[in-house]
Amino acid sequence: MKTKDAVAVVTGGASGLGLATTKRLLDAGAQVVVVDLRGDDVVGGLGDRARFAQADVTDEAAVSNALELADSLGPVRVVVNCAGTGNAIRVLSRDGVFPLAAFRKIVDINLVGTFNVLRLGAERIAKTEPIGEERGVIINTASVAAFDGQIGQAAYSASKGGVVGMTLPIARDLASKLIRVVTIAPGLFDTPLLASLPAEAKASLGQQVPHPSRLGNPDEYGALVLHIIENPMLNGEVIRLDGAIRMAPR
């Protein structure tokens, strides 16, 4: 699948890994619809091939409207799920037991939201004419927490583990439609989630990465997205993008 002239949808595309992906896609010649809760000012500065659609990824109608906007630009070929959130709550703590509503919120956004965008995006892609061997590709974002969850990450790890777990069966589901599904599991990246940390703390985190011993650059995530789009044999796979880190319990 060639990225040039393709129509892509990126959730969470106004910041962090999603914004880096959006910029990479635009640089490669794609048209991009950024789906996010806020960030129209950011997207407005990216040029006329970038559009903004405000939507909660768990909202079926809002996501459908965003995909309708993408369809108006041409056949949708690429969907990248970067929207997500997290919390740090122990099952039992001084504050009491983990609130069920807090657990559900994380799973709803990270797992159910990803699936919602995936299924509606797949429906659009399946209606397009094949280009060579395929119609399109869907790329999801998990986390190394799916494999090495730390203390306080029960909800986050469960949500990202769900994204990992559904990758292969959905790739098999969509194979007959000529749609690929791949998941990226990033490690420690320099994103807005870490923006509040002092420089010394971020440097300390980076030193935990075996090689290269630093935080990942969001552009490196975007580079992998482009490679996945253009490599037709990448399908049903979860790729750890983490510098060989394996997270300690805390």
From Swiss-Prot:
Record EC number: 1.-.-.-
Top-rank taxon, per record: Bacteria
A GO term, aspect molecular function: oxidoreductase activity
Gene Ontology cellular-component terms listed: peptidoglycan-based cell wall; plasma membrane
Keywords, comma-separated and alphabetical: Oxidoreductase
Residues noted as binding NAD(+) in the record, renumbered to the chain: S15, L17, D36, D56, V57, C82, Y156, K160, F189, T191
Active-site residues, Swiss-Prot/TrEMBL: Y156 (proton acceptor)
InterPro entries: NAD(P)-bd_dom_sf, Sc_DH/Rdtase_CS, SDR_fam
Binding site for substrate: S143
Membership in a protein family: Belongs to the short-chain dehydrogenases/reductases (SDR) family.
Protein's recorded name: Uncharacterized oxidoreductase Rv1144
Species name: Mycobacterium tuberculosis (strain ATCC 25618 / H37Rv)
